């Protein structure tokens, strides 16, 4: 199974995705970590662009056929990145579960963005203005959605787990 968490920075994707990965023993791929490793390597002359997503796609595709559940944590702001995950799941012959994480309380979302510590060495967390300006296309087909303004991270992991179990039933 390929589980892809999407949403703007500061919505709670990482907290929920890590919690779920620990709970189910899944392989966890975080786009921010991959992109920062690419920057740190000095291999790229310019901004990372889509290369972080391409690395994550390849890592997912190499692990899914081994029977591993893979959880991806990234903004996935455009149709191109979302379509790529669908293609990876199809190539691997596994189910794709898209989960969009939102925070409907704008003040709470801003507070999270402005107060969260950076947890990827070398990566400066985004500013609130950069989150507001971030490209984020509407979904063609609405995915399963979690609103972190309405629940704790523990509750969110529980709801996602229930959704995954119900989808297999």
Q: Where are the regions that the model predicts?
A:
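Walker A (P-loop) ATP-phosphate-binding motif of ABC ATPase nucleotide-binding domains
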Residues: 2
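Hydrophobic anchor at the beta1->P-loop junction of P-loop NTPases
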Residues: 5
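P-loop (Walker A) phosphate-binding loop of NTP-binding proteins
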Residues: 8
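Conserved substrate/cofactor phosphate-moiety recognition/catalytic segment
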Residues: 11, 15-66
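Glycine-rich phosphate-binding loop used to anchor ATP phosphates in small-molecule kinases
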Residues: 51-96
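Conserved phosphate-donor/acceptor-positioning beta-strand/loop module used by diverse small-molecule
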Residues: 92-112, 146
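Small-molecule kinase domains that catalyze NTP-dependent phosphoryl transfer to phosphate-bearing small molecules
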Residues: 115-159
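C-terminal alpha-helix
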Residues: 159-167
């Amino acid at each position: 199974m390929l589980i892809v968490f999407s949403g703007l920075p500061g919505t709670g994707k990482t907290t929920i995705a890590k919690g779920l990965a620990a709970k189910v023993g899944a392989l966890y791929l975080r786009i921010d970590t991959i992109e920062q490793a690419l920057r740190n390597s000095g291999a790229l002359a310019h901004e990372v662009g889509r290369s972080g997503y391409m690395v994550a796609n390849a890592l997912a595709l190499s692990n899914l056929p081994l029977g591993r559940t893979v959880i991806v944590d990234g903004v996935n702001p455009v149709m191109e990145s979302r379509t790529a995950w669908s293609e990876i799941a199809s190539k691997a012959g596994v189910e794709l579960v898209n989960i969009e994480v939102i925070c409907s309380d704008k003040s709470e979302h801003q507070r999270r963005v402005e107060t969260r510590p950076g947890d990827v060495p070398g990566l400066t967390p985004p500013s609130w203005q950069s989150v507001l300006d971030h490209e984020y296309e509407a979904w063609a087909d609405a995915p399963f959605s979690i609103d972190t303004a309405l629940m704790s991270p523990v509750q969110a992991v529980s709801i996602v787990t229930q959704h995954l179990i119900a989808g297999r039933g």
